[in-house]
């Protein structure tokens, strides 16, 4: 039950009534009419902008139109007050029965409460895509958690979602990986090695070298580089991806598709060559020279005639090169081919989750997706800012020794999956995140993950208290739904909890539409806080205790309320990929 959608429909019906009575002209554009929470909760339960956005088209004063609409809305018994504020906003105060119906809906729908049928076709979300050259670091973890939570969020809102990882296994960096692993292979066979500048010095490649020695013995030593390099490269990539998958599994990250970059460039150029042919057929490829970029020239800029894509026709700043001077494809050409492949597989919305250093990538790829799909697909690029590791407010040294750094696995082992996931999502993705290893394990209100999980655990602790105080009573959701008298819930704290529960479907919907899972984390903290506050009031005022053995009616009503609120906490935590414990240990 989404009260915002429900009363948006009611507002539209009231506007139609005004049209039928001649007080509004026909054919008004209602697409911008919304119902949302008022900016100040003291003004009411809902607010609509209808009078403001329609006044100009209707050629009416917005306040006068607002008064006419408010008068029409007051005829609805579910609306106890409709008042015009400011330039023409209409604030609505709802009858208690509306919120009682929300609680009943939450109890009857269980984990499906708030989940929607968001319009739109299949979504492809690509996230993590860390180079298979070493362990994941904390920055990778932020993108992984954000992408996974966004996938959960869109799925909860009703969109079909494909979760994808792009394996960068075709660039020069995997040859560097292979040569580094080959040195560790020689080391495993007893040689003393020196790792030259430009190769990967980390100890994480020692086990790869040992497994190479176990698999191949000394045979690779007798082969020239052009023979052993492809074998070691494939072996090392597989080993790195196995390590990355283990790290992802440790924080509950999953993917449906692992797509290899190398598969794009098959025989005769493969899918990248197909892309160039498709762009040529559209008249979007030409031979020309690019003007020098402003400021310091990048190393890869060349003053020569090049094969260019007309990306500036689709919103990019300049046209882009598709072929290098040696005739090989540019990274950009491969990226376009990959995104075209995602679209051809059926996704009409593509989302890339990338590090903040990819800001320059956004316009060109959005232009490319628009071009290859003839405007049928759109690309949203979500950039994740840096993570600063702290311990009790002091920066943590990221490098432990030469070639070694603090890995995502180190952080998982220290603070656990739930703390990482919740805190990575408790700040907007494009803002730098301070992750304090000491604070995220505190058992206090200042630690959001503890505070929200404690709110969910409280759902079960009050249920245990009720069973002890009133043995033989049935406190299942179905029983509470059948006979709890919700009209006794009149305390401001109870009303606040009901209002927050009623907001959950809209929070889920708006967070999904904006691609912003942090909204769920903020909402969960506020909702858990409302339960903790009411619980604390009951310690001082016996009549407000959730479980009162001498008052069966209030006990059952409050348990119904807590059960509904706890269900919302569990649902929201599931979207974030965080556990909802029945008790805190």
Swiss-Prot record:
EC number(s) recorded for this UniProt protein: 6.1.1.19
Positions of short motif 'HIGH' region: 130-140
InterPro entries recorded: aa-tRNA-synth_I_CS, Arg-tRNA-ligase, Arg-tRNA-synth_N, Arg-tRNA-synth_N_sf, ArgRS_core, DALR_anticod-bd, Rossmann-like_a/b/a_fold, tRNAsynth_Ia_anticodon-bd
Entry keyword set: Aminoacyl-tRNA synthetase, ATP-binding, Cytoplasm, Ligase, Nucleotide-binding, Protein biosynthesis
Key word Nucleotide-binding present: yes
Pfam families cross-referenced by the UniProt entry: Arg_tRNA_synt_N (PF03485), DALR_1 (PF05746), tRNA-synt_1d (PF00750)
UniProt catalytic activity: tRNA(Arg) + L-arginine + ATP = L-arginyl-tRNA(Arg) + AMP + diphosphate
Primary location: cytoplasm
Entry's Gene Ontology cellular component terms: cytoplasm
Subcellular location(s) per record: Cytoplasm
Enzymatic class: ligase
Biological-process GO terms, alphabetical: arginyl-tRNA aminoacylation
Gene Ontology molecular function: arginine-tRNA ligase activity; ATP binding
Assembly and binders: Monomer.
Family membership: Belongs to the class-I aminoacyl-tRNA synthetase family.
PANTHER family assigned to the protein according to its UniProt record, in alphabetical order: ARGININE--TRNA LIGASE, CYTOPLASMIC, ARGINYL-TRNA SYNTHETASE
The name this protein goes by in its record: Arginine--tRNA ligase
Organism of origin: Methylorubrum extorquens (strain PA1)
Taxonomic placement: Bacteria, Pseudomonadati, Pseudomonadota, Alphaproteobacteria, Hyphomicrobiales
């Amino acid at each position: 039950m989404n009260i915002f959608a429900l009363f948006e429909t009611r507002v539209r019906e009231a506007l139609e009534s005004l049209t039928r009575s001649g007080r509004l002209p026909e054919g008004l554009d209602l697409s911008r009419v919304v119902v949302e929470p008022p900016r100040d909760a003291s003004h009411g339960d809902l607010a609509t902008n209808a009078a403001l956005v329609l006044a100009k088209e209707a050629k009416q004063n917005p306040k006068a139109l607002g008064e006419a609409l408010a008068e029409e809305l007051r005829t609805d018994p579910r609306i106890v007050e409709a008042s015009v504020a400011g330039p023409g906003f209409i604030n609505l105060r709802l009858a208690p029965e509306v919120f009682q119906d929300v609680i009943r809906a939450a109890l009857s729908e269980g984990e499906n409460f708030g989940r929607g049928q968001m319009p739109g076709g299949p979504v492809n979300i690509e996230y993590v895509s860390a180079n298979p050259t070493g362990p994941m670091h904390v920055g990778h973890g932020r993108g992984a958690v954000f992408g996974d939570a966004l996938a959960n969020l869109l799925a909860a809102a009703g969109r079909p979602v494909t979760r994808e990882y792009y394996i960068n296994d075709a660039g020069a960096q995997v040859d560097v990986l292979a040569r580094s692993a080959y040195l560790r292979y020689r080391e495993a066979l007893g040689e003393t090695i020196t790792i030259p500048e430009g190769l990967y010095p980390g100890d994480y490649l020692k086990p790869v070298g040992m497994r190479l020695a176990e698999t191949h013995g000394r045979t690779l030593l007798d082969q020239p580089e052009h023979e052993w390099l492809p074998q070691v490269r494939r072996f090392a990539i597989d080993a790195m991806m196995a390590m990355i998958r283990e790290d992802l599994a440790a924080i509950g990250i999953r993917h449906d598709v692992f797509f290899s970059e190398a598969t794009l460039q098959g025989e005769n150029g493969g899918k990248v060559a197909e892309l160039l042919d498709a762009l040529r057929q559209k008249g979007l490829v030409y031979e020309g020279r690019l003007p020098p970029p402003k400021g310091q020239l990048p190393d890869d800029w060349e003053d020569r005639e090049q094969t260019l894509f007309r990306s500036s026709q689709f919103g990019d700043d300049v046209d882009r090169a598709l072929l290098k001077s040696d005739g090989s494809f540019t990274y950009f050409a491969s990226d376009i081919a990959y995104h075209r492949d995602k679209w051809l597989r059926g996704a009409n919305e593509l989302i890339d989750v990338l590090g903040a250093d990819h800001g320059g990538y956004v316009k060109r790829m959005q232009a490319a997706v628009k071009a290859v799909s003839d405007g049928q697909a759109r690309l949203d690029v979500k950039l994740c800012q840096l993570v600063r590791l702290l311990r009790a407010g002091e920066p943590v040294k990221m490098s432990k020794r030469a070639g070694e750094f603090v890995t995502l696995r180190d952080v998982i082992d220290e603070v656990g999956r739930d703390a990482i996931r919740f805190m990575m999502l408790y700040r907007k993705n494009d803002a730098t995140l301070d992750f304090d290893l000491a604070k995220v394990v505190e058992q206090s209100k200042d630690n959001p993950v503890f505070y929200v999980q404690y709110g969910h655990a409280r759902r079960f602790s009050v249920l245990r208290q009720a069973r002890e105080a009133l043995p033989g009573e049935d406190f299942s959701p179905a029983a509470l739904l059948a006979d709890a008298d919700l009209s006794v819930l009149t305390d401001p704290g109870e009303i606040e909890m009901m209002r927050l529960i009623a907001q959950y479907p809209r929070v889920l919907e708006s967070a999904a539409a904006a691609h912003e899972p942090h909204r769920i984390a903020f909402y969960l903290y506020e909702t858990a806080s409302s339960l903790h506050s009411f619980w604390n009031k009951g310690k001082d005022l016996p009549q407000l205790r959730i479980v009162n053995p001498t008052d069966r009616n209030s006990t059952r009503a409050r348990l119904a309320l807590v059960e509904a609120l706890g269900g919302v906490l569990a649902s929201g935590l599931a979207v974030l990929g965080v556990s909802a414990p029945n008790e805190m240990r």
